[in-house]
Structures are given as structure tokens and as C-alpha cells.
Amino acid sequence: MNIIDELEWRGAIYQQTDEEGLRKWVEEKQISLYCGIDPSGDSMHIGHLIPFMILRRFQNAGHRPIILVGGATGTIGDPSGKKEERKLQSMEQISKNVESLRVQLGKIFDFEGNSAASMVNNYDWTKDVSILDFLRDYGKEFNVNTMLSKDIVASRLEVGISFTEFAYQILQAMDFNHLYEFNDCRLQIGGSDQWGNITAGLDLIRKKQGENAKAFGLTIPLLTKADGTKFGKSEGGAIWLNPEKTTPYEFYQFWINTDDRDVVKYLKYFTFLTEAEIDELAKQVETEPHLRAAQKTLAAEMTKFVHSEEALEQALKISKALFSGDVKALTADEIEQGFKDVPTFVAEDTEANLVDWLVTLGIEPSKRQAREDVANGAIYINGERQQDLEKIMDASDRIENKFTIVRRGKKKYFLVSYK
């Protein structure tokens, strides 16, 4: 199957500059193509994954992906999709962000073999361009009227846009031209809001490399959820690829909670399952939605892809423990992941009567309520029901000598650590 056909059945193409030409080009040749990301933060979130998944599909089809981290463009900020001017970051912070993104992107692509990926930083070829060189060699090629008509600029004219952000499309065009000339890069991929920047790059390539220069642009539809809200956010905020910001367990849970109306679309966008495999899961969504087979598959595939098989096994173990209440077998690391959002308390490193301990920490409001809950079997320590009013809490009630998990009733959890 032609890679363009695959992207079409996955619903992953919004616009193409020359569909017929690109389709023929990828059938006849191994091409290099690129997608960029600016280091505005130290982690990608799952929304950033969308264009890079397309890049990875091209790699799987035998083409060479180029991942561009914008050490130069990141100092300015892309105005696309923004209603106001971005706050500029220090060069030191941008450099740190670049390195963090390199690590995350490095896990997504294969950097060996005939279709090996490469990673570049546009700061390397932009840092020595003087202001006079910029104006003479590049600014001269851009018509201000054309630049003003681009959606990314036109949408900001009423509230105002600085020359810095106005010139962003020139810098991105310079990137495409540089990669065309020195890396034989023929295709740029981006979100639907990048159309203006991509076409600016194609115009520059034709002016610099000749009218017959073969280069293409492809954009991806804006991904929204069935309820109309923006994809990539949960009630707690963005879902990050950095495991220190979003744990693998939280990452897994995001996908497992996907709405039935969205799950097939996400399987097409984010997994490498075949059309037949996804069709089978789609049938199960219709006939046996309670089994959530599609969601389980999506969550497993994504957690493995972004993190690892081991991270998936941990997420499954935590999920099973929380569902069953049997939490004693969890490791300290797994507890930190699974109980990240529950009320947390710090206890003295001493022995104490269970009832007093619960009240002192604030888990129970009074001794009377604590005694009642213990006597009625509503208190669990590390998954085990406690009904002994005289029980002494000691080191044996700690997991890896770090945590005690308290449950009140069926689902109310508390996490206790020690001084």
C-alpha cells in the first residue's frame, strides 16, 4: 500500500500541496522528510505526537525522517494558533529544553538501518546568519502582502503582532530550504495550523533552488474529541511524554478512559495496527463495549511505544491492584505512580495505636469516628481489613519501609509516608 493511501484511510491527511506528485514521488524513490518542534517546554505532550506519528509511518514505509528541534525558532516562538505574543525564554532554558526533547524523540524513531532517522537543530545553520544576510538573502524573497494574508498573521492583526513573530515564517522557510539543499529533504509535515509556514518554505525553495525543484507539504487535521474539547488534555491538564510529569500509569489511564466515540479514530492515528485489526476492534466497540477491548489495546500500544514494555507491565499491575484492593505487592515506585493524586500524609517514625494514628494524621476526624470505622471493618491497611481497636502500627505495616496505604470504605485511599 502506498504510504499516502495508508494515511488517507487513517484519516491523517488534511491538506497536500501536490497529492499526485507526492504519491508518485514516494512510490518511485526513498525520500527524506521532516517535521519540527520548538523547545518551548522541557517535554512534549501527546498532542505533539500526532505529526511525529506520521513521520514514523513514513520511516516504516522505507523513507528517511528528519526530526528538527528548533533551537533557533524556539527563541522567537511560532505565532500559529496563539492569540497573544509568546513570552521569550532565555537561551539557557531553550538549550535545556532542546536536550530534553532530543531524549524523548530519540525513543520514537529508529536511528539505524537504510531508513535511519536523523535529528537536527536549526540553531546550527541560523546562528551565523547576520541581520544583513537575513534581509538580503531571505527577506528580499518574501512579499509583505503575501505574508499578511497568511492565516497565522491575519488572525493576529487586530490585537497586534511583533516583527519578531511576523518573521517566524521566514525562519521556518529557511529551515525547509536548508534541509532541501543539504539533506535532500522533499517533504515537510505539520499540523493544520502550519499550512502557511509550509507553503512559505515551498515558495522559498522554488526561488532559491529553481522553479523545477520538487518539494511538497502535507498537513494533518486538528484532532478533537467527540465532546468537542481539545485532544491531549485531561482534567488534570496536559498528558506529557516525560514520565516525571505524567507517570506511565497516568499515561495508560488516559488512553484506557477514551470515549467509545473516539477510540477507533485514536487507534488509526496513534497505533501501527493494521486496517483489519482496527476494523475488528471497531466491531467489538459496537457489540461488546463493556469489555473495552479497543481501549485496552490502545492504552497498551501507546504505553509501550512512548515508554516501554516494562512500563506497561507496571501500569497493568497498578491498575489491577487498585481494582482488586490487593495493594501489598506493589513496589514503592509503583505506589508513587498509582497514588500520586490521593491525599498524602507524613507520619512520625514511631509506633502508635491504629485509632490514634488515624486521628493524628487527619485521616479520621475524631476518635469516635475512627473506632466506629475500624470496628465496622471499613479501614484497610495495605489492602488488609483492620478490626482490632488495639492494633499497634509499626514498621511491619510499611511497604519497603516507605509507605502505608490506607483505604476507608471501598474506594477512598490515603497514602502515608514517614519522616
From Swiss-Prot:
Pfam families: SYY_C-terminal, tRNA-synt_1b. Belongs to the class-I aminoacyl-tRNA synthetase family. TyrS type 1 subfamily. The keyword Nucleotidyltransferase does not apply. It comes from the Bacteria. One of its GO terms (biological process) is tyrosyl-tRNA aminoacylation. It is found in: Cytoplasm. NCBIfam families: tyrS (TIGR00234). This is Tyrosine--tRNA ligase. A motif ('KMSKS' region) lies at residues 230-234. Keywords: Aminoacyl-tRNA synthetase, ATP-binding, Cytoplasm, Ligase, Nucleotide-binding, Protein biosynthesis, RNA-binding. One of its GO terms (cellular component) is cytosol. Catalyzes the attachment of tyrosine to tRNA(Tyr) in a two-step reaction: tyrosine is first activated by ATP to form Tyr-AMP and then transferred to the acceptor end of tRNA(Tyr). It is an enzyme of class 6 (ligase). Homodimer. Its main location: cytoplasm. The gene is tyrS. A motif ('HIGH' region) lies at residues 39-48. It comes from Listeria monocytogenes serotype 4b (strain F2365). Its EC number is 6.1.1.1. HAMAP family: Tyr_tRNA_synth_type1. Residues 352-418 form the S4 RNA-binding domain. GO terms for molecular function: ATP binding; RNA binding; tyrosine-tRNA ligase activity. L-tyrosine binds at Y34, Y168, Q172. The keyword Transit peptide does not apply.
